[in-house]
Design a protein with these regions (language model features):
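Aromatic "clamp/platform" in nucleotide-sugar-dependent glycosyltransferases that forms part
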Residues: 257
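Short hydrophobic beta-strand element within catalytic cores of glycosyltransferases
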Residues: 274-277, 284
């Protein structure tokens, strides 16, 4: 039986903090097990990628316990920050790093050099790298000159779903994602302000505790006159609750500054929901193209001039 040791962050199954990366990791583990692999999962404590000494020590212990020659699949949130634990073990283990978002893509200016150096060392020592989009593979090449043949793309799948009935008025907007600077909720509210004369309401579904100061600012902005009572923040939703949120929507809106893929995009499309999203990262791969090779609705930005 083929074996794989999978190292994932603490909280991977926490319903209060859902994420596309956690969902992807969990589905990979289940998929490998369904194919007959023996999956040995190791959850590492800490607030990765900013885990403290205890988290890094736990990772080092976990890696040292893995037998020689084993395949080790590591979530990039962990791996990309831990060259001290991983690089010395690279000759002994077949390390495969799953990069959801390169930490070196948009790090804080005062940390950029150190963040990129650590990620570069880990990826250079890895046996292979897996990304969730072709955009991410290209970005790793730009950042670290990784040969394309060492970086494998495994796009997320999407479950089939019934068509979302939506609303009679057709004015229900839905934004799914943690309220963080990267997801651009401030940009979304600014855009909604420009169409305040139209009929719409927007439900924002996602964790509010990832960047609490930012989330508080966004929510205060949503309470101002032109947006009051039109934008709601419900916190995270998973399973049937998230299904109901999709079913009640007429349009998915996504204002992210960076996305390696955008699993919520394919979740919406699977339900027949149209999507209006920023043209960043791998979002265009998630959206796909029409038969003529163009993205449906690409000219919608010109519709209100």
């Amino acid at each position: 039986m083929t074996e794989v040791h999978v190292i994932v962050p603490e909280g991977i199954d926490d319903p209060a903090r859902p994420s596309g990366g956690n969902t992807y990791d969990r589905r990979v583990c289940r998929g490998l097990a369904a194919l007959g692999w023996a999956v040995h999962e190791q959850v590492v404590p800490g607030a990765w990628p900013r885990a403290g000494e205890a988290g890094h020590a736990a990772l080092a212990r976990a890696v040292r316990r893995i037998p020689d020659g084993a395949v080790v699949l590591l979530d990039g949130l962990i791996a990309s920050t831990a060259p001290e634990a991983l690089v010395p073990q690279a000759r002994r283990l077949r390390q495969v790093v799953l990069v959801h978002m390169p930490l070196g893509h948009r790090p804080p200016d005062d940390e950029a050099g150190a963040v990129r150096a650590r990620e570069r060392d880990v990826l250079a020592a890895a046996t292979a790298v897996v990304t969730t989009s072709a955009w991410t593979r290209r970005r790793l090449g730009e950042l670290y000159a990784l040969p394309a043949d060492r970086v494998n793309v495994a796009e997320p799948g999407v479950d089939t779903a019934g068509l979302a009935p939506g609303t009679t008025a057709g004015d229900a907007l839905l934004c799914v994602g943690a309220v963080t600077p990267a997801k651009g909720h401030d940009v979304l509210l600014a855009a909604l302000t420009t169409v305040a004369d139209l009929s719409w309401r927007c439900a924002c579904v996602g964790s509010l505790d990832r960047a609490p100061a930012f989330a508080d600012r966004v929510r205060r902005r949503a309470w101002k006159d032109e947006l009051r009572d039109r934008v709601g923040f419900s916190g995270p939703r998973t399973g049937p609750e998230l299904d109901r949120a999709y079913a009640a929507a007429d349009l998915l809106v996504l204002a992210s500054h960076a996305e390696t893929y955008g699993m919520v995009v394919t979740e919406a499309l699977a339900r027949g929901l149209p999507v209006l999203a920023t043209d960043v990262g791998g979002v265009t791969e998630a959206l796909g193209c029409g038969k003529d090779g163009t993205r449906p609705g690409a000219r919608c930005c010109a519709s209100r001039r």
